[in-house]
Amino acid sequence: MLATHTRTVFYISDGTGITAETFGNAILAQFDIRPRHVRLPFIDTEDKAHQVVRQINHTAELEGKKPIVFTTLVNMSVLKIIEDGCRGMLLDMFGTFIRPLESELGVKSHHRVGRFSDISVSKEYSDRIEAINFSLDHDDGQSHRDLSGADVILIGVSRSGKTPTSLYLAMQCGLKVANYPLIPEDFERRQLPPALVPHRKKIFGLTIDPQRLSQIRNERRPGSRYADLVNCRNEVAEAEAMMRRSGIRWLSTTTKSIEEIATTILQEVRPERLQY
């Protein structure tokens, strides 16, 4: 179903606004609307809060609809100005979750701006950077070195979604992910590439509908044999047959988001070292 109407959506924070936008997008994805996104970060003074109120109210007047306003504001005086003054539908995420938790836990939260992504809190930041570097070094079969250090190894035909999934797992979960493209030489051998065999338990396969694969490849190399539908059908069939013979778990990425693919991989492979 196509989106039926538009609505301006504000994401307001005294930090970067990334958390507000992430939560907001997750919620809005449940509705058939076409949002116009406006992120307003670093709203950390009362003067800035009054400017935000004017911007929201101007938008409401122009469009004749209440803008949707997601906030992750720690500063209560700033939040109150926006709550009291704006003519939008305000959804205060921190207020929704933090204040009930304070009551239940019997302790006050830190009320620190940017606490969610504070890189000084622990060594998780450096671990994630290390995971990203590992995943880049081992992208598309570039390196077979230190595969024993990989948490997950993805295999599949070219353009089946291995690279974006690898980077998502590295950035969001701190996992070291290698990925390897299955090519005609692998199909001729009818078995996994020798370098991957010792790490079979870490391997997860991605496949894709041949017609969709042909469309994706045509965007990259239009009219080529690489993008030809018959070739795509053959490659996908060979890859799936190899994964079945080798006992490799796999899924089709055709209609799935990166988040859905990554979650399935985590459930199936269950890597020991996992950060959220």
Swiss-Prot record:
Belongs to the pyruvate, phosphate/water dikinase regulatory protein family. PSRP subfamily. Its EC number is 2.7.11.33, 2.7.4.28. InterPro entries: Kinase-pyrophosphorylase, PSRP. PANTHER family: PYRUVATE, PHOSPHATE DIKINASE REGULATORY PROTEIN 1, CHLOROPLASTIC. Keywords: Kinase, Nucleotide-binding, Serine/threonine-protein kinase, Transferase. ADP binds at residues 156-163. It catalyses: [pyruvate, water dikinase] + ADP = [pyruvate, water dikinase]-phosphate + AMP + H(+); [pyruvate, water dikinase]-phosphate + phosphate + H(+) = [pyruvate, water dikinase] + diphosphate. GO terms for molecular function: ADP binding; ATP binding; phosphotransferase activity, phosphate group as acceptor; protein serine/threonine kinase activity. Bifunctional serine/threonine kinase and phosphorylase involved in the regulation of the phosphoenolpyruvate synthase (PEPS) by catalyzing its phosphorylation/dephosphorylation. It is an enzyme of class 2 (transferase). This is Putative phosphoenolpyruvate synthase regulatory protein. Pfam families: Kinase-PPPase.
